């Protein structure tokens, strides 16, 4: 599987914030997107997964000679956790598992993977900020999608949870998954995966594509 972005431009509020942005990632690879606040990290991720239309350029996901819809192949984890506060943790994850299809881990195993065993019955709204984020990470595990697009995924996590998520990302890559992550802090991926195999972590600094710099 291969994801290509060619000459992308993105805008916010009618103003172009980045342009001439291109990259390619393949099976078992990750792209870590960095840059200052307002540089377009979140806008880029929303364009890639199809939530926003690009101002220019295109995004294409292929498997062999077949074009694959990105929305059908990706998990998107944004700033919001996209969970119903009144529903239990299990009910929320079950909804996303059925909605996304391609069942992977069962809900109990996914919660164990994020060190939240025993909270299935609790309303999501009862959880702490860090626990809510970990449940949202568990959403990535209960149904299989080859491409993870995650925006500040470690927001609200403690150091132990950050390390745990880094290992989940590495495992996803070892299983031929792809990751695009926007972050302002290290995610624990750089240098963690050998570049002699499929695993390869690349970085993209949005500041290099700002309209001010290009002008």
From Swiss-Prot:
Give the subcellular location. Answer: Cell inner membrane
Superkingdom of source: Bacteria
EC numbers listed for it are: 7.6.2.5
Which enzyme class, named as a word?
A: translocase
Q: Please tell me where ATP binds in this chain.
A: 35-42
Q: What's the catalysed reaction?
A: heme b(in) + ATP + H2O = heme b(out) + ADP + phosphate + H(+)
Q: How does this protein lie in the membrane?
A: Peripheral membrane protein
Subunit-structure text: The complex is composed of two ATP-binding proteins (CcmA) and two transmembrane proteins (CcmB).
Report the PANTHER family cross-referenced here.
Answer: ABC TRANSPORTER I FAMILY MEMBER 1
Q: What is this protein called?
A: Cytochrome c biogenesis ATP-binding export protein CcmA
* Gene that encodes it: ccmA
